[in-house]
Amino acid sequence: CQACVDACQLDTLKTRKDIIPVVQELHDYDGPIYAMVAPAVSGQFGPDITMGKLRTAFKRLGFTGMLEVAVFADILTLKEALEFDKNINSEDQFQLTSCCCPMWIAMIKKLYHQLLPNVPGSVSPMIAGGRTVKALHPKAKTVFIGPCLAKKAERKEPDLVGAVDYVLTYQELRDLFSVTNIDLASLPEDNLPHASEAGISYAYAGGVSEAVTETVHQLNPDRQVDIKTRKADG
């Protein structure tokens, strides 16, 4: 959320900026470049700025297209729901969600090793999206746009490297629209909806567990063991 950077009175915390490398790629690279927007993008640029307007804006910047990462959140929700329904068969068993949060996963790996068996074996929607794009378009470059600085570190994890080439925050994207004089409100719509409400809900606090719970109920409405969720606010 960058609150630590903004609050640092000594000005010793700096954020990595990827605008210039992305602009250079858009200008020089002769292959496809895809923008992948996080579920939280909805409403970030004003109540009247739709996904269709954003898709038009990305194409004007030079991107081949815009993909909603929420569709990969949908896929991973289904995967986690299937794992939950298979593995959780009593009240004392539990599963940890939020595979999409690199800091959450890093904390478990570094401080709570005993909980690793309770973490689904899923990558984040960002990584899943990048890998899918590159499987379909091997020469493609991928640029993820989202609210979280930690995504910049996640893309460079040894077991994840290569899926996403660059990460921009929403502020970086605003700056990019500003310097290129792109007025989102005046753009025409380019509509191509990708995701369901479950995938989009990943943007909200507790949204992942709610999406998994709802999907488990849809997959197995006769399930005997009740699902109870607990939220851990960081």
Each model region followed by its residue ranges:
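Processing junctions and N-termini across compartments
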Residues: 1-2, 142
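Iron-sulfur-associated redox domains of electron-transfer enzymes in respiratory
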Residues: 16-234
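Iron-sulfur cluster-binding cysteine motifs and their immediate structural context
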Residues: 2-19
